[in-house]
Amino acid sequence: QAVSQALERKPDCILCMDDRLTLLAMNMLKQQGVRVPQDIRVASLYDSSALAESSPAITAVQFDAYALGRKATQQLLQALKGREVETRVELGYQVSMRESTKT
């Protein structure tokens, strides 16, 4: 349902939260006759062999979710104590560019 709603806004790209949701979105797009990457580009915020082996292979961003959660928890605890928190936090990531985002 979320994919159908997103398509109504005619986005350039759909970014999914994990590999399972990404594969579900790809199936729905295929059922609706939407071509990836010709009509829309698709990427995931989690990488897996299933994404690399899908057709088309799906672009993915890999990051340390544990480090993200740890930093978010630290920030929340600081805020709850009334202390100033960082407004900008940078964490490392790696992008695996694949067929689903090529134009």
Task: Pin down the residues of each PLM region.
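Helix-loop module immediately N-terminal to the HCX5R catalytic loop
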Residues: 1
